[in-house]
Amino acid sequence: MSDKKIKGLEWQEKPLSDNERLKTDSNFLRGTILDDLKDGLTGGFKGDNFQLIRFHGMYEQDDRDIRAERLEEKLEPLKFMLLRCRLPGGIIKPYQWIEIDKFAREHTRYQSIRLTNRQTFQYHGVPKGKLQPMHRLLHSIGLDSIATAADMNRNVLCTSNPIESELHQQAYEFAKKISEHLLPRSRGYLDVWVDGKKVESSDDLLKIEDEPILGKTYLPRKFKTAVAIPPLNDVDVYANDLNFIAIQDENGQLCGFNVLVGGGLSFEHGNTKTYPNVAYSLGFVPLEHTLAAAEGVVKTQRDFGNRSDRKNARVRYTVQNMTLDGFRAEVERCMNIKFEPTRPYEFTERGDRIGWVKGIDNNWHLTLFIESGRITDKPEKPLMTGVLELAKVHKGDFRITANQNLIVANVAEQDKAQIEAIARQYGLIQEISKLRENAMSCVSLPTCPLAMAEAERVLPDFISELDKVLSKHNVADESIITRITGCPNGCRRAMLAEIGLVGKAIGRYNLHIGGDRAGLRIPRLYKENITLQEIVNEIDQLVARWATERQTNEAFGDFVIRSNIIAPVVNAHIDFWDATKIIPTTII
């Protein structure tokens, strides 16, 4: 960490969090993980290793459905790991899918593959004894899970725009470059998981494994990056610490990016020092300075981000402490150039184009709706087998979207009928409402240790109830962006939904309304600590008014604000917790 101290960063006078000690003592993230792998007395990791495995893309979890039962039997919780792959832009080849499918079936407790809204896949329920084989498998097919969790730059998102294929490819290449550029330089991941060799700390190692961008204590907190291609904001570009909005020149070629910082959706119930936030614009950079801008933002966060209080350690709090102008000036100093004025752009939609679309290169792309991103086999819907069968014949690639769906991309005209037949056979093509198409949930119970309420397991029935409400008021063909998360950690971006549910306790949620369709506005708390049925009743009343009082093409989230049902969140750090403090201004 830098020795720099500037006005407004009072945290620098306070003790560092223990995570900073942990990273310093970790021998560049190796810890004693190899020793723990040999310990068969527990299914989990001890001491610092419990946290260190996160830097390698894993979390220790257990099955909370049977936790009490095992406690009665005097057994430790049934521990296992979540593995999150690094997959910039969400592109994966069919041969890679075949291998990850095989591992999921043979070695995970839940025999499923979970698509995430960060455009990658997760395994749930991997036993400790299968971790090294899993990482070696990923390595053998050109994948890894480096830096998909913990205090690093996580999986980089990129708009899944199959129509503008050339522009998408250009932006995707930059998403990959950004991901690679911001990776840790340490060989700790390979030493532990692939080579399985113990490396002792030494002065020579310190010289070899210098971390010129991240530093030896890495970043103060998680760091998320996205690349968006207007007019589609499928990646929720305002929700990330660092964001790049692709700008085209007069010939339709990528010429640079608008750079935004300070987005993030996590907060803590009742803690008014925490808040969700939409990102602020720093300005425009031409293509040749893109990596310098990314590095400059990361270095600024590295040096000035809060390392004392992890609840205030994300980039948005650093921007608040330094001021936006102060943050911009430090980034410009790091990259040795000035930002140009922000270039004009417009986002008009956020969801995926479900079904077939044709690209400008005449290839076809089939977007499959995957509810909550869960790919598994059920008697009525053998989705996992269906995707496997597609992988066996598909000649293009798969793209995981930021809405947890799957695109069968680059299908030739002559292969289209075969792809569609397989997808229909296994229930991968289905008739769904617009409401369901635009709904998301986090995993939550039974595996997430932070979950306060259900999410994925209640979403299907909850959306069915809301579908009835929309039909009742003759707006069944309309879309309301609805998201459920089991806690306020923000994993499924409920704080950018028109209707956002945030878990408060088992069976109870806080209801937020008033986000917009473009993903520019934070929804405000409307009702606190109520049941799902009470939420349905509240939405019934709101939709009744929306259906009869709205203006032409007025979205639900815009209506509840125009009608003064709820006040907008204008400056989240000022008015998220108290609408009486609103100071009218622009959001970005």
Curated annotation (Swiss-Prot):
It catalyses: hydrogen sulfide + 3 NADP(+) + 3 H2O = sulfite + 3 NADPH + 4 H(+). Keywords: 4Fe-4S, Amino-acid biosynthesis, Cysteine biosynthesis, Heme, Iron, Iron-sulfur, Metal-binding, NADP, Oxidoreductase. It comes from the Bacteria. Its cofactor is siroheme; [4Fe-4S] cluster. The keyword RNA-binding does not apply. [4Fe-4S] cluster binds at C442, C448, C487, C491. GO terms for biological process: cysteine biosynthetic process; hydrogen sulfide biosynthetic process; sulfate assimilation. This is Sulfite reductase [NADPH] hemoprotein beta-component. One of its GO terms (molecular function) is NADP binding. The gene is cysI. Its EC number is 1.8.1.2. Component of the sulfite reductase complex that catalyzes the 6-electron reduction of sulfite to sulfide. This is one of several activities required for the biosynthesis of L-cysteine from sulfate. Siroheme binds at C491. GO terms for cellular component: sulfite reductase complex (NADPH). Pathway: Sulfur metabolism; hydrogen sulfide biosynthesis; hydrogen sulfide from sulfite (NADPH route): step 1/1. Binds 1 siroheme per subunit. Pfam families: NIR_SIR (PF01077), NIR_SIR_ferr (PF03460). Belongs to the nitrite and sulfite reductase 4Fe-4S domain family. Disulfide bonds: none annotated. Alpha(8)-beta(8). The alpha component is a flavoprotein, the beta component is a hemoprotein.
